[in-house]
């Protein structure tokens, strides 16, 4: 069997009992980063062989996972943090498994997407954009496609680009409030809510979720 296992965003105490059992019973654990996987497994006192499932090599990595499954091995698939399949190569794995009729099971766990909805108080409808394109023109077009819908938007962003995203939001929708969520579940977790220009600063640290609220005026 192939399991897609949700793992903590940062606080290792967020691991579920079912996830611990599945990781302990698996023959192999697939991961994006062996360093992060080893940190979690060591905390749980679990030793397992590790293989990669990374975006850059997802085709060959998925092929290996499927081969192990056909050999009768149990594979637990993880991501660096949160749920596999959300803005990571787990989505490609699921499509390939479904296309080949290979069964798999999801072991639910922490999700930055779900937590950001709860923390921000965002109401439906909303859209999850994941990580926006790297190129500025494509990022702009993506936002210009969704902003006129006047629904909540949830965006993942790293420390080196979040300032540029806020500047772009300040240009495109300065009247819409934004929740800037940093280092969710971690020691330095921080939630800031304001207009884009109020959240812009020279530098940022940590991983971010940016929530764009609908316009209060409905425009």
From Swiss-Prot:
Reaction(s) the record says it catalyses: cytidine(1402) in 16S rRNA + S-adenosyl-L-methionine = 2'-O-methylcytidine(1402) in 16S rRNA + S-adenosyl-L-homocysteine + H(+)
Cellular component aspect of the GO annotation: cytoplasm
Class of the enzyme per the UniProt entry, highest EC level: transferase
Subcellular location: Cytoplasm
Entry-linked SUPFAM superfamilies: Tetrapyrrole methylase
EC numbers on record: 2.1.1.198
Any one Gene Ontology molecular-function term assigned to this protein's record: rRNA (cytosine-2'-O-)-methyltransferase activity
Keywords linked to the UniProt accession: Cytoplasm, Methyltransferase, rRNA processing, S-adenosyl-L-methionine, Transferase
Biological function: Catalyzes the 2'-O-methylation of the ribose of cytidine 1402 (C1402) in 16S rRNA.
Family statement: Belongs to the methyltransferase superfamily. RsmI family.
Record-linked PANTHER family: RIBOSOMAL RNA SMALL SUBUNIT METHYLTRANSFERASE I
Protein name, entry field: Ribosomal RNA small subunit methyltransferase I
Organism: Coprothermobacter proteolyticus (strain ATCC 35245 / DSM 5265 / OCM 4 / BT)
Designated gene of the protein: rsmI
């Amino acid at each position: 069997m192939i399991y897609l296992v949700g793992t903590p965003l940062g606080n290792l105490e967020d691991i579920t009992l079912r996830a611990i059992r599945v990781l302990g019973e698996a023959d192999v654990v697939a991961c994006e980063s062996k360093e992060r996987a080893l940190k979690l497994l060591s905390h749980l006192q679990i030793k397992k062989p590790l293989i990669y499932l990374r975006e850059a090599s997802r085709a060959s990595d998925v092929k290996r996972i499927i081969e192990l499954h056909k050999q009768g091995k149990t594979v637990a698939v993880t991501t660096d943090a949160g749920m596999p399949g959300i803005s990571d190569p787990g989505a490609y794995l699921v499509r390939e498994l479904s296309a080949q009729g290979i069964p798999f099971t999801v072991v639910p766990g922490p999700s930055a997407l779900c937590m950001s909805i709860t923390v921000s108080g965002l109401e439906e409808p909303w859209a999850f954009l994941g990580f926006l394109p790297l190129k500025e023109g494509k990022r702009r077009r993506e936002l210009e496609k969704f902003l006129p819908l006047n629904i909540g938007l949830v965006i993942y962003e790293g420390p080196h680009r979040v300032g540029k995203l806020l500047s772009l939001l300040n240009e495109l929708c300065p009247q819409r409030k934004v929740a800037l969520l940093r280092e969710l579940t971690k020691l330095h977790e921080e939630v800031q809510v304001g207009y884009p220009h109020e959240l812009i600063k020279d530098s940022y640290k940590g991983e971010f979720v940016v929530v764009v609220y609908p316009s209060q005026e409905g425009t």
